[in-house]
From Swiss-Prot:
GO terms for molecular function: calcium ion binding; enzyme regulator activity. InterPro entries: CALM/Myosin/TropC-like, EF-hand-dom_pair, EF_Hand_1_Ca_BS, EF_hand_dom. SUPFAM superfamilies: EF-hand. Ca(2+) 1 binds at residues 21, 23, 25, 27, 32. Coiled coil: none annotated. This is Calmodulin-like protein 1. It is a lipid-anchor. Residues 154-165 have a biased composition (Basic and acidic residues).
Length: 187
């Protein structure tokens, strides 16, 4: 993943990382991670930092090596690109550009990509993503739905990569009772 970074980006990240690597051993503490990221223009929340730390600090030693940090920054940059992709995807669905995806707009876009949906299916998709219950999907709801889909995909990929005995259809993330996840997958 870090191989997707330019030499200039790697140099910038190394410089920021080095500022906090006080003893020059090539690692920083997890507590310093937020400070380093903020110095690079990122603004992670405390919860995001905890997620990143648990993802990166695989040996739970409280230190993050530069290589791990590069992987993390590459993911953050890719996620930033993903945000632009989400905005563009939302605009595709939001035909009248009013900031909401209606059932009619959803049905129209899905039909254009070859998915003929019944009124009931469209209604289920809307209600699964419609957190505020107004009968439409706003941008925040769209993002939550898509991010949930992305998380499920990462979990499945990790499970497959780890060689777990569970299949993609096993476990709570793919259980039929979890309609929310299944409906968002179509979006």
């Amino acid at each position: 993943m870090a191989d997707q970074l330019s030499e200039e980006q790697i140099g910038e990240f190394r410089e920021a990382f080095s500022l906090f690597d006080k003893d020059g051993d090539g690692s920083i503490t997890t507590k310093e991670l937020g400070t380093v990221m903020r110095s690079l223009g990122q603004n992670p929340t405390e919860a995001e930092l905890q997620d990143m730390i648990s993802e990166v600090d695989t040996d739970s030693n409280g230190n993050i090596e530069f290589k791990e940090f590069l992987g993390l920054m590459a993911r953050k940059l890719r996620d930033k690109d993903s945000e632009e992709e989400l905005k563009e995807a939302f605009r595709v669905f939001d035909k009248d550009q009013n900031g909401f995806i209606s059932a009619t707009e959803l049905r129209h876009v899905m039909a254009n990509i070859g998915e003929r949906l019944t009124d009931e299916e469209v209604g289920e998709m809307i209600s699964e993503a419609d957190v505020d219950g107004d009968g439409q999907i706003n941008y925040e709801e769209f993002v939550k739905c898509m991010m949930a889909k992305k998380r499920r995909k990462r979990i499945e990929e990790k499970r497959d990569h780890d060689g777990g005995s569970r299949t993609k259809s096993a476990g709570p993330s793919a259980a039929p009772a979890s309609k929310r996840g299944q409906k968002c997958v179509i979006l």
